[in-house]
Amino acid sequence: MGCSASKPSEPSNAKLPSAPVPKKVEQVPEPKPEPQPQPEPQPQPEPPKPAEPAPAPAPAPEPQKPAEPAPKVVAVEDDTNEAYGLLLCGAGESGKTTFTRQLKLRYLNGFNEKDCRDFLRTIRGNLVETMQLLLVWLEHNNIEIEDSELSSMAQDIIDVDPQDCEFNEELVEKLKALWENEQIKKAFEHKDETAVPDHMPYFFAKIDELAGEDYIPSNEDVLRARIRSIGIEAITFDLQGARIRIFDVGGQKSERSKWANVMNQVEGVIFCVSFAEFDKPMFEDQNVLRINDSLEIFGNITHQEKFSNSPIFLVCNKFDVFTEKIKNTDAFVKIFPEFSGDSHNPEACADYLIQRFLDKAAPLSEDRPIIQYKIVALNGDQVVETADAICKFISDKYYQDA
């Protein structure tokens, strides 16, 4: 018996069910976490700047040499050697004698006791002479002193010799009483019409001192004493070897003839003129103004052939009194009616007067300079400054190649 084999079954054409399509799962993204707020950045401190190098020490200054003192003008006692001569001249009352006295006080040893005693006699005579001039003015203007006692005193004063009188208590009391009189005060207000010196109130204020038996005049007294220059006086100066000799000559008409005695010893001129007395008459001639006399002398001097190439130093003196007179009076325009500037401006009036002098000296040239100074001769510093400047000019111009 055989065994029978099984027949394999044929594959079935039946379709298998499709595998289920897996569902697409959408991935929902997880929300991103919100960024945490970052702390604001703190400002970082600036790195420290490197220290600047210390500046190099400044070089030590070189030691400075002490400034050399300006060359000094000195007076010379022994004036016998040759020197550059200057003629110090001008009309009367121009102040050149005061200028010379200042030179003596500042550069030399001043005045000895004998000189001062002589000045005291002069000052006392000035007091008497002044009162006489005021009394004469009253008489000329028909003004009488009303007080009978004072009128009698006035006659006594008229009879006194100013240069040779005993300055006793009786005379002093009469002078004091008259000085306080209203008529005399009125006369003094018109002193510019007379030859009365400007300084007399200074002396009347100290008349009791001046009457003292042992009184010795001060330098201020000496500078104000009025003495008409007689003769010729010389003072010699030295500036670094440059010798300059100043010859002071009298300014009154009677003294001018003596100027010829020193002409062969001088090369230049210092000419003094009082600007303050432009409206005052000459002492010698009441009909001639002092300023016109000065202009005439200046013209004559500057046109001498000897001075055709010489320096001329024009010293315009008493500028303080001139300034007050110009500011407070109409005197300038009365004397110079042709003046078209401001007659109350001292500088404008002074410039006008200076031009009048320059016109007298025309023609001008570089070889003959005319150098002007406005000064107050009573001021010693101004006189010294002027004298120094004159000496320096002479030294530079005439001794520089010596």
UniProtKB/Swiss-Prot annotation:
Region of interest (G2 motif), ranges: 221-229
Biased composition range(s): Polar residues: 1-12
Composition bias type Basic and acidic residues, residue spans: 23-33
Region (G1 motif): 85-98
Compartment(s) of residence: Cytoplasm; Cytoplasm, Perinuclear region; Endomembrane system
Record domain G-alpha: where: 82-402
InterPro entries: Gprotein_alpha_su, GproteinA_insert, P-loop_NTPase
Region (Disordered), start-end ranges: 1-70
UniProt subunit comment: G proteins are composed of 3 units; alpha, beta and gamma. The alpha chain contains the guanine nucleotide binding site.
Name of the protein described by the UniProt record: Guanine nucleotide-binding protein subunit alpha-1
Organism (species): Trichomonas vaginalis
Upper taxonomic lineage: Eukaryota, Metamonada, Parabasalia, Trichomonadida, Trichomonadidae
